[in-house]
Amino acid sequence: MGTVVIVGTQWGDEGKGKITDFLSQGAKVVSRYQGGDNAGHTIHANGEVYKLRLVPSGVLYPHQLSVIGNGVVVNPKSLVGELARLAEQGVTGENLRISDRAHVILPYHIKLDKLQEAAKGADKIGTTNRGIGPAYMDKAARVGIRMADLLDKEIFEERLKANLKAKNEEFVKVYDSTPMNFDDIFEEYYQYGQQLKQYVCDTSIVLNDAIDKGEHVLFEGAQGIMLDIDQGTYPFVTSSNPAGGVTVGAGVGASKIDRVVGVAKAYTSRVGDGPFPTELLDKTGDFIRNAGHEFGTVTGRPRRIGWFDAVVVRHSRRVAGITDLCLNSIDVLTGLDKVKICVAYERDGERVENYPASLKFLSECKPVYEELPGWQEDITKAKTLDDLPENARRYVERITELLGVDLLTFSVGPDRDQTNVLENVWDKVSR
């Protein structure tokens, strides 16, 4: 048996897609287990740039199965479009499997997402307006429509009518907005379901069979742990559980998980609103944003930038049970005279070592920094830690010391051959 979970340790955009693509070379199955098409990631492979939102990274390799688990909320329109774009790049998608238990995002979810966000005004969460939250709300309220329902014309019609009636009343009475048309949604989305029908199955069986056969299975988390609805900066979070969602979102037992790989950038970024203790609002932040091309894959929005926050990543390590660390984008910091690491917070003269649940408490905290000398040398061709200039190497070593976790890989650029392996995670699960 060999299973590895990949999770983001910050607020998403840590480079999980790249690491998933890299580690998937040793996997037979790659599966997503939560989130939706709000979680874009970019993969550079075979001289092509692939921008994925719903489809797992393994779809690029015909010998692997790519699984969208039951914990993912699926926008059929978005998924059909993504598969069409991949086909234009020569990726067939024949190795894709979609859980029949995955919930479906429909147009009324997207409309409700936008109306709810607009109604909050200055208190908005900063969602991607893709209907993720409302779809998970329907799931929790037990009125959601699943992939299995979408494929059954009679069931889909019955449930869509009931749901749309309730949603239209909400649109008109609560938000003073126009109702949506049943026929338009029904015909369009039933056809999307028929186009996806060939991929739909009980993916829990697929995953557990692969694990029981001793095959390597890689689970790909979306967003980051600081966006986890339970462990993140609530309410400025997503609607799912990147931290521990793999067991329920993929339908595999906790006893079948071997390693949890945490992915972090050598600095911090965030899209949307919410607390960000190490945020840089000066020219240093602009330098890092431009050097790192820090603009959202899905939204195109400039990401907020800050120094590496060890308090955040230690919190993520603890709540997700992280066993190994992948550190990305070290090269982005090249050219800075000094670099900083947040090692703790300070509040009213007292040192705070752990990330607080109260956002009011957090707003009263100031970061405590360690300052290290920067480096000017080009590190994009480095293959080992010894190839790094002394200051860059010391920066990496200090991060791992503060986190108390072994470094699995470090990256000095966006391409796959710029990800350098210190230890093969698949060797670890085979021991």
UniProtKB/Swiss-Prot annotation:
Molecular function (Gene Ontology), one example: adenylosuccinate synthase activity
Involved pathway(s): Purine metabolism; AMP biosynthesis via de novo pathway; AMP from IMP: step 1/2
Reaction(s) this enzyme catalyzes, per UniProt: IMP + L-aspartate + GTP = N(6)-(1,2-dicarboxyethyl)-AMP + GDP + phosphate + 2 H(+)
PROSITE patterns for this protein: ADENYLOSUCCIN_SYN_1 (PS01266), ADENYLOSUCCIN_SYN_2 (PS00513)
Keywords: Cytoplasm, GTP-binding, Ligase, Magnesium, Metal-binding, Nucleotide-binding, Purine biosynthesis
Cellular component terms (Gene Ontology): cytoplasm
EC nos: 6.3.4.4
CDD domains, per database record: AdSS (cd03108)
InterPro entries documented for this protein: Adenylosuccin_syn_GTP-bd, Adenylosuccin_syn_Lys_AS, Adenylosuccinate_synth_dom1, Adenylosuccinate_synth_dom2, Adenylosuccinate_synth_dom3, Adenylosuccinate_synthetase, P-loop_NTPase
Pfam family name, one: Adenylsucc_synt
Enzyme class: ligase
Cofactors: Mg(2+)
Protein name: Adenylosuccinate synthetase
Organism: Lacticaseibacillus paracasei (strain ATCC 334 / BCRC 17002 / CCUG 31169 / CIP 107868 / KCTC 3260 / NRRL B-441)
